[in-house]
Amino acid sequence: MSNSWWLKPAQAIDVPMREAALARQQQLTKPAGSLAQLERLAVQLAGLQGRERPAVDQLWIAIFAADHGVVAEGVSAYPQEVTGQMLHNFVNGGAAISVLARQLSAQLDVVDLGTVSPMDLPGVRHLRIGAGTANFAHGPAMSVEQGLAALQAGRDSVLRAKAVGTELFIGGEMGIGNTTAASAVACSLLECAAPLLVGPGTGLNAEGIQHKTRVIERALALHAEQAGDPLNSLFCLGGFEIAALAGAYLACAQEGIAVLVDGFICSVAALVAVRLNPSCRNWLLFGHRGAEPGHRHLLETLQAEPLLDLGLRLGEGSGAALAVPLVRLACELHNGMATFAEAAVADRPA
């Protein structure tokens, strides 16, 4: 494809700043390694931000919303109109991610990529690619042109974020049926059996999970030629919001903005991004381990070290947002603690 912008290498890690941050950690008034993952997080951020003392003051949360044609197969516990209703809820401040964004003083960018019913909501950026995806149980979820537009929508949000000095980017999603699409994409990329990854999504019972699994298995057979191919798997089985998330993660890595990845659906988008451009992996931090059974498998595949494990399954970017205070505290500890020399404390046990 011409203008395959996603293949541009990610920005390089600032190794000298990372090493300087590591050296500082070793001089702080605590036993070496005692703050464990928080130490590693601060050092990692120092390398990503190119400064010995990192900070996460400017936070951008982008929510990409779209509907899914596969809902016609009866794979969701909720009706499709909920996607549009939640767009209202996001901009009216009543959704979980809206509350979290306020508390974290984050910029909230809500993007409609294609709900079934067109809407004109103040506070929502309307970048309609279509009236939801097509039913991937019968054909490709989207055309190549639609898929490229969705990738670009994610990139556009990142460029907006960069323009205001964003230091950490969180992507979230809304779309009834999107755990089905995400599971299908993951199965195609990992070339694994659907029962290993498929879960309840928004609340299916055991019978519903079995039906959802069968729908995905039929779709995987239909699109078997795309197995292992990140772009084709995304376009044949994914959703506009999943493609936008993948585009956002790729753009963040290219623009030098650290990412805090949310749950199962966002991790599938991260897998797509890494398969398209492995150099973006260094820029991805992971907020939490969710309840969806496939999430653990994805995190292992991506060699991720999530910050939280609360059994969450909401989406919207909520799990990543909940991890932001830990990220900020990791920076505060790194930046604010005294060194042994400053505190006149012996730096070795007697």
UniProtKB/Swiss-Prot annotation:
Disulfide bonds: none annotated. InterPro entries: Nict_dMeBzImd_PRibTrfase, Nict_dMeBzImd_PRibTrfase_bact, Nict_dMeBzImd_PRibTrfase_N, Nict_dMeBzImd_PRibTrfase_sf. It is an enzyme of class 2 (transferase). GO terms for molecular function: nicotinate-nucleotide-dimethylbenzimidazole phosphoribosyltransferase activity. GO terms for biological process: cobalamin biosynthetic process. Gene3D superfamilies: 1.10.1610.10, 3.40.50.10210. The active site is at residue 316. It holds the Pfam family DBI_PRT. This is Nicotinate-nucleotide--dimethylbenzimidazole phosphoribosyltransferase. It comes from Pseudomonas syringae pv. syringae (strain B728a). The lineage of its organism: Bacteria, Pseudomonadati, Pseudomonadota, Gammaproteobacteria, Pseudomonadales.
